[in-house]
């Protein structure tokens, strides 16, 4: 009986002390912004489907720089060219990092590539490797035959549609063109020609893209991970990670097969496997590093048609008109 009584008397004292300590804690000087609710902040006030419009309206009310409280994460939003230049150019090193979000960290093998990796010595060395061996002008030029071939294939398809008076969906064609070129350059395969593999490929891509943009509440309120588990997000993320890891491993094993039929020019996986055996760099590349880089290419090989830019379609139409008139 004595212990519950002591707890009843001491807990309120500790609670009041905690509240007083929070009040005494000096708040950081942040730009103005909408008031949020305790713990969740402004999360309930934002709708991802119309987020750009909401941020635009907030900038009209609070100015070109304002703050949001996303759970326990403080966020600064800028909406003017002058401030964007300050952040992205003049102070790019200070703002070069990305927040560590669960799906991105999991699917990128804890930031083992250069997109989700924090700015540090590892990132700088990986960037040097990519610039020198993967994205160099010589390497890009070596894939010109692939680009020319795939563009010819697209023109043939458009010509076939035109001769049969069929409707041409430029968005689908451009998505297919981009996806095929990246896959051939990165993996050495043309998944558009393979029935079951094509279905598996696009299924993995769709799930990867969805998970990358899925809201995990534990990313913003750390002690709420159980909510993500109840919603099945952790199981879904783990399942997709294992399926992708299996896919990456199949690609690597295929390239390491001594009996593999080589098409001629090395693809990106061939280059990465060579770099793995090269000990002249300050970091030792592992298979996880290679898989992390493959994830970036894998993700970039697909663009959802609903997000496809109208501007790109206009440029493509203009390019086709130039070909027709010349």
Question: What do the PLM-derived regions correspond to, one by one?
Answer:
Residues 99-107, 141-311, 318-326:
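Cytochrome P450 heme-thiolate monooxygenase catalytic core
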Residues 39-46, 87-88, 305-314, 324-326:
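Short hydrophobic alpha-helical segments that form membrane-spanning helices or hydrophobic packing faces
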Residues 7, 66-69, 124, 286-290, ...:
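Short hydrophobic/aromatic segments of transmembrane alpha-helices and their interfaces
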Residues 4, 133, 318-321:
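Hydrophobic alpha-helical signal peptides and transmembrane signal-/tail-anchor segments
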Residues 2-3, 18-21, 45, 59, ...:
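Hydrophobic transmembrane alpha-helices
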Residues 25-146, 170, 174-184, 197-225:
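Cytochrome P450 substrate-recognition site 1
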Residues 1-26, 180:
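Terminal signal-anchor or tail-anchor transmembrane helices
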